[in-house]
Amino acid sequence: MRNLLLLPLMAMLFSGCGDSDLTPEEASAKKFDVILTVVENGVTFSIKTYVATVDDKDKVRGYFSDVASLINSLVDSGKVEPDVVKKYIADGINEKVPVPFNTAVLGALDLGLSAYNGFYAANVKDNLANKEKAVKVLKAIAAGIQSGVDPVSGDVNVLVNPLIGFTDWKL
C-alpha cells in the first residue's frame, strides 16, 4: 500500500527532469515562470480558502480588491523594496479594511509577501538589474488576489505548466 502512495510522488519528481537543451537564459526564464506561477496560485488558493469561510463574501472580496489596487499603485510608484512594500501594504490594509478583517487579509497575503521578500533578498538586493523581476512578482501577487476574489472562475494568468523540465531551482 505504501508503494502505491509513492508512485504519484515519484512521477511528479521525475516528470520534471531537466531539459539539457536549454540555454542558461532560457532555464532562468523558465525558473522565474515557476516562481510567478507558485506565488500567484498560492495567493489565489489562500484568498479563495479565506473567502469560503466568511459569511459576508462580497464585503471581503471588496477588501481584497482594495489590496490588489494598493499593490498595483505600489508597483506604479516603483518602490519595490520589501520594507517599503510591507509597510505600504500593512498601512493601506489597516486604513481601508476594518478590524478584524484587516488581520485576516494580512494573514491571507502572508504566503505571497513572504515569497516576495525571499525572492527580493536572493535576487534583487545586490543586483538591481533584477528589479523588473521583483515588479513581476508583485504583479503576480495582485493577479492572485484578483483570481482569488473572482467567484466564478479564478483562473490564473499562466496557461501552461512551467514545472515541465526542471530540477534546478536556483536562478
Predicted features and spans:
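Sec-dependent bacterial lipoprotein signal peptides
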Residues: 1-16
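Cationic, hydrophobic amphipathic alpha-helical membrane-interacting segments
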Residues: 17-171
